[in-house]
């Protein structure tokens, strides 16, 4: 659904007739809209790495749900064709679930977490500044800050009382397009891929037992919204 919405938005931008001049060196762009993180999660099996059962492989895989929040972009045009951009958003929330382990009691919700994915990118706009339609590509670096972790029902039922996950650094890529409705107002559609790798842990502090799972979150991120140029 998200891919279809993004594609339709780009097509609508592409066929519209130019009405206003687009980006120039020194412009400041602010965009806001609905942003969806869709994890393409792959993971290791669940392993006990601390306590009397250390080294035990429980099998299984981790999954994360999608979430939609308010997305924000702040960009500065270094030249007519090159800009620097910061992605921000309100916190995303995900449930980390486990399925397929050798112990049925271990399957289910491992924990929940929130995260912020600030991403700094260099963005290239190939078309002339006079074009109202401005497709672009970009690449940059992401820092995913994970916080507000809570142990899940499946983990707590097995005596685990703590859940946490590591923050992540990774590369990010994006494609998108602006279409100028006026000299200042634009509509925008964009999609990103971000390399997010984390390790989630659950602890049974009373018994000194810990289990972990490595997760390649690697989400596709879709955003559609409006922007304003200063």
Predicted regions and their residues:
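Predominantly the C-terminal beta-signal and adjacent terminal strand-loop region
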Residues: 93-97, 182-230
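Short glycine/proline- and aromatic-enriched beta-strand/turn motifs that initiate or cap beta-hairpins
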Residues: 21-73, 227-229
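Short sequence motifs at beta-strands and strand-loop junctions characteristic
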Residues: 62-68, 112-117, 163-170, 214-219
């Amino acid at each position: 659904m998200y891919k279809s919405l993004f594609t339709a938005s780009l097509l609508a931008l592409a066929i519209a007739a130019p009405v206003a001049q687009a980006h120039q060196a020194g412009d400041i762009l602010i965009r806001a809209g609905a942003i969806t993180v869709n994890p393409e999660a792959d993971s290791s099996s669940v392993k006990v790495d601390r306590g009397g059962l250390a080294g035990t492989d429980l099998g299984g895989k981790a999954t994360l749900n999608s979430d939609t929040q308010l997305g924000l972009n702040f960009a500065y045009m270094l030249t007519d064709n090159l800009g620097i951009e910061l992605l921000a958003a309100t916190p995303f929330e995900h449930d980390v679930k486990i399925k397929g382990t050798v112990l049925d009691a271990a399957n289910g919700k491992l924990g929940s977490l929130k995260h912020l994915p600030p991403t700094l990118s260099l963005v290239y706009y190939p078309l002339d500044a006079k074009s109202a339609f401005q497709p672009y590509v970009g690449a940059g670096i992401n820092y995913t800050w994970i916080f507000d972790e809570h142990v899940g029902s499946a983990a707590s039922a097995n005596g685990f009382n703590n859940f946490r996950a590591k923050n992540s650094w990774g590369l990010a890529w994006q494609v998108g397009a602006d279409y100028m409705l006026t000299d200042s107002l634009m509509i925008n559609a964009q999609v990103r891929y971000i390399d997010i790798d984390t390790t989630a842990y659950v602890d049974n502090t009373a018994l000194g037992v810990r289990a972990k799972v490595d997760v390649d979150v690697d989400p596709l991120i879709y955003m559609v919204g409006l922007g304003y140029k200063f």
